[in-house]
From Swiss-Prot:
Source organism of this protein record: Cupriavidus pinatubonensis (strain JMP 134 / LMG 1197) (Cupriavidus necator (strain JMP 134))
UniProt-recorded name of the protein: tRNA uridine 5-carboxymethylaminomethyl modification enzyme MnmG
GO molecular function terms attached to this record: flavin adenine dinucleotide binding
Lineage per the UniProt record: Bacteria, Pseudomonadati, Pseudomonadota, Betaproteobacteria, Burkholderiales
Gene name of this polypeptide: mnmG
Keyword Cell wall biogenesis/degradation: no
Quaternary context: Homodimer. Heterotetramer of two MnmE and two MnmG subunits.
InterPro entries, per the entry: FAD/NAD-bd_sf, GIDA_C_N, MnmG, MnmG-rel, MnmG-rel_CS, MnmG_C, MnmG_C_subdom, MnmG_C_subdom_sf
Localization per Swiss-Prot or TrEMBL: Cytoplasm
Length: 646
């Protein structure tokens, strides 16, 4: 049957990508339908019970800066919070939280059910409605046809998914859920390029059977307690729990080696490539044969369960081998396994067939986000979902797509890497992937993206008000620090030495003093009984005050480095944003070799910058392209969220 109501946007899948996509499109005012095979698993954390980490936490902050749900849900569900790399520079500091699975799922579902313009429907999708080269809807497994102007696919690991435990395997999207076989077949029928990847998960353990007394306790950060959302507060956090650390040993490794003849990875049963940066324990033993042990983190799954997630022993070995290897680990000698570990193999679709908006180049109105694009991780999925949802909304409203630049957001780095380089293994975000990471910090994600989000219609009044107060206070106080001067008379030696280590010998601005490595903002403001503090408090909200102080301090201390990086961005920007005509035949560009023109015709980059990052495209080829564009008068430039003729 044809459903009587037509929608603007349909989102297929209710994981981390799908929920952010649906919420974003609905916040933009689009009539949105989220189709999921099971409403009870909306926002399900399919693998580890944690959010964030190096590079990943940056993505979560960016999603939050644009009104997304992941950070706020984590603040409500997080049972341990830590700042990683806290002793290092601000560019690589990252927030990570353990989350209660049940509370996280509840937080996401609450937001979905209360979001205006968004409807939920429980049915798996088997088919897409395509007319010509345009998607017009989706069909569920019982034949209900829903029509829409745009469709966002966020199918995760469900597309033709196959679960492996030892040499046994069966179809499934994850443990306990069916695979999406018909939809995968339909996408292949549409001639969309695809491949096969795999990921895995460890056995889960009953905490009542773990001997924590022989393990190292790992508590969360307490002073201060971190929050994920720019609007989050520590008092939102539920009860906090520690994690625990143990290690594999030589006996563990011998057990694993003895089981490799029944490993689906090492017997050729699994064809898909697994994630390099989250390898299975059998892969670790093989790749790092000289290591005597590997660290294992015992992570609590929640406040109302005894289940623990042993991070570090993801495996698809037969269950009898899993049992033996778990029992060989200190503290787990008597452990009871609640669920066996497994690997899952699934279809992904080549992201090089997508525009920077995550819209298919072949089928108008069809967007892809999450693991279907070859990524791994909740955070990477959520960020893509946000972008796909926004651009589906822009497509429906006939507005230009928003495509963040590499110097603007980790989301820009992520998407640019995917659409220019593709994937040969599941893609994970790291800070090292960003050329301009000093400017792409967790702490300034809102400064980079909230204004853009407001223009796009995804940032509400509460967030916008808090952002403006923060931005104005940072600007006002930074200027005051630059224009307030002290000299040896105003700041005598007896006051200067405790803070600076020596007297000042000439006149300095307060910004000059703050730039010194040993000086922090609060101490500078407390100097001489608060004589140099602002007359009016920066903000009445203590949480916002902390963010404002952090922004001021980083901005002043790293001003020179940030300014140099901004100059580098300006130099690159002209070529980076020069648009390439959609119909350009690269074989007609004089001087381009056959291989280069073939690759460019195959991948159809949207900008000169994207073309430069395609494997095999040389700087000389980019110069030839630039000459060709100028000669033909074809070059156009692209801004951060609009496209216009130069």
């Amino acid at each position: 049957m044809l459903y009587p109501k037509e929608f603007d946007v349909i989102v297929v899948g209710g994981g981390h990508a799908g929920t952010e996509a649906a919420l974003a499109a609905a916040r933009m005012g689009c009539q949105t339908l989220l189709l999921t095979h099971n409403i009870e698993t909306l926002g399900q954390m399919s693998c580890n019970p944690s959010i964030g980490g190096i590079g990943k936490g940056h993505l979560v902050k960016e999603v939050d800066a644009m009104g997304g749900a992941m950070a706020a849900a984590t603040d409500e569900a997080g049972i341990q919070f830590r700042i990683l790399n806290s002793s290092k520079g601000p560019a690589v500091r990252a927030t990570r939280a353990q989350a209660d699975r049940v509370l996280y799922r509840k937080a996401i579902r609450t937001r979905l059910e209360n979001q205006p313009n968004l409807m939920l429907f429980q049915q798996a999708v088997d088919d897409l409605l395509v007319e010509g080269d345009r998607v017009v809807g989706a069909v569920t497994q019982v034949g209900i046809a829903f029509r829409a102007r745009a469709v966002v696919l966020t199918a995760g690991t469900f597309l033709d998914g196959k679960i492996h435990v030892g040499l046994d395997n069966y179809t499934g999207g994850r443990a306990g859920d069916p695979a999406s076989v018909s939809l995968s077949a339909r996408l292949k029928e549409l001639k969309l390029p695809q491949g096969r990847l795999k990921t895995g998960t460890p056995p889960r353990i009953d905490g009542r059977t773990i001997d924590f007394s022989v393990m190292e306790e790992q508590p969360g950060d307490l002073d201060p307690v971190p929050v994920f959302s720019f609007l989050g507060r520590p008092e939102q956090h539920p009860q906090q729990l520690p994690c625990w650390i143990s290690h594999t040993n030589s006996r563990t490794h011998d057990i694993i080696r003895g089981g490799l003849d029944r490993s689906p990875m090492y017997t050729g049963v699994i064809e898909g490539v697994g994630p390099r940066y989250c390898p299975s324990i059998e892969d670790k033993i093989h790749r790092f044969a000289s290591k005597d042990s590997h660290q294992i983190f015992l992570e609590p799954e929640g406040l109302t369960t005894n289940e623990f997630y042993p991070n570090g022993i993801s495996t698809s070995l037969p269950f009898d081998v899993q049992l033996e290897l778990v029992h060989s680990i200190r503290g787990l000698e008597n452990a009871h396994i609640l669920r066996p570990g497994y690997a899952i193999e699934y279809d992904y679709f080549d992201p090089r067939a997508l525009k920077a908006s995550l819209e298919s180049k072949a089928i108008s109105g069809l967007f892809f986000a999450g693991q279907i694009n070859g990524t791994t991780g909740y955070e990477e999925a959520a960020a893509q979902g946000l972008l796909a949802g926004i651009n589906a909304g822009c497509y429906v409203r006939e507005r230009d797509a928003w495509t963040p630049r590499r110097d603007q957001a980790y989301l820009g780095v992520l998407v640019d890497d995917l659409i220019t380089r593709g994937v040969t293994e599941p893609y994970r975000m790291f800070t090292s992937r960003a050329e301009f990471r000093l400017s792409l910090r967790e702490d300034n994600a809102d400064m980079r993206l909230t204004e853009v989000g407001r223009e796009l219609g995804v940032v509400d009044d509460v967030r916008w008000d808090a952002f403006n107060r923060k931005r104005d206070a940072v600007s006002r106080e930074t200027e005051r620090l630059k224009s307030t001067w002290v000299n040896p008379t105003i700041l005598p030696a007896e006051d200067a030495v405790p803070l600076l280590g020596k007297p000042i010998e000439r006149e300095y601005s307060l910004a000059d003093l703050l730039r010194r490595p040993e000086v922090v903002y609060n101490d500078l403001m407390a100097l001489q009984g608060g004589r140099h503090a602002p007359e009016v408090p920066l903000d009445g909200d203590p949480l916002l005050m902390d963010q404002i102080r952090e922004q001021i301090e980083i901005g002043v201390k790293y001003h020179g480095y940030i300014a140099r990086q901004a100059a580098e961005v300006d130099k690159l920007e002209a070529n980076e944003s020069t648009r390439l005509p959609e119909g350009l035949d690269y074989t007609e560009v004089r001087g381009l070799g056959f291989e280069v023109s073939q690759k460019l015709n195959q991948h159809r980059p949207e900008t000169l910058g994207q073309a430069s990052r395609i494997s095999g495209v040389t700087p000389a080829a980019i110069s030839l392209l630039l000459v060709h564009l100028k000669k033909k008068g074809l070059g156009r430039t692209r801004s951060g969220n609009s496209q216009e003729a130069a």
